[in-house]
Amino acid sequence: MAKKVANIVKLQIPAGAATPAPPVGPALGQAGINIMGFTKEFNARTADQKGMLIPVVITVYEDRSFDFITKTPPAAVLLKKAAGVEHGSGEPNTNKVASVTKDQVKEIAETKMQDLNAADVEAAMRMIEGTARSMGFTVED
């Protein structure tokens, strides 16, 4: 028989750097999860992606067991890394802070494809380009 789901917790945690300190500890503690067990497993699973922000969906069951799914880093994080900037523009319509190439956008779209609601890579590229424009980046051919 399937376990009954008690709670679903969504967090964004730096890869390989989950600690029991806030915000991870309190969120997991409220859900009744073994915090050290989660942090060790998460850090082991994401050790190869150090420095990236990883979204994670934790499913907590009534018997206090859990499992989790890691997703691909947010498009904004991947775009900032590709452009080599710290953060996007506060005024994206008037102040452009960086530029990314179509090749970089395609690479990001292929990375994010499993998490995007897109039929093909072209549609995913359009989504990533929209994110880039809203961050004050220009997309060059």
UniProtKB/Swiss-Prot annotation:
Example GO BP: translation
Signal peptide: none
Domain of life: Bacteria
InterPro entries with a match to the protein in the record: Ribosomal_uL11, Ribosomal_uL11_bac-typ, Ribosomal_uL11_C, Ribosomal_uL11_C_sf, Ribosomal_uL11_CS, Ribosomal_uL11_N, Ribosomal_uL11_N_sf
KW rRNA-binding (keyword) present: yes
CDD domains with a match to the protein in the record: Ribosomal_L11 (cd00349)
Example of a GO cellular component annotation carried by this entry: cytosolic large ribosomal subunit
A Pfam family hit: Ribosomal_L11
Post-translational modifications reported in the UniProt record: One or more lysine residues are methylated.
Bilayer-crossing regions: none
Keywords assigned by UniProt, alphabetized: Methylation, Ribonucleoprotein, Ribosomal protein, RNA-binding, rRNA-binding
One Gene Ontology molecular-function label: structural constituent of ribosome
Keyword DNA repair: no
Role played: Forms part of the ribosomal stalk which helps the ribosome interact with GTP-bound translation factors.
Record text on subunit structure and interactions: Part of the ribosomal stalk of the 50S ribosomal subunit. Interacts with L10 and the large rRNA to form the base of the stalk. L10 forms an elongated spine to which L12 dimers bind in a sequential fashion forming a multimeric L10(L12)X complex.
Family: Belongs to the universal ribosomal protein uL11 family.
Protein name stated in the entry: Large ribosomal subunit protein uL11
Originating organism: Limosilactobacillus reuteri (strain DSM 20016) (Lactobacillus reuteri)
Top-level taxonomy: Bacteria, Bacillati, Bacillota, Bacilli, Lactobacillales
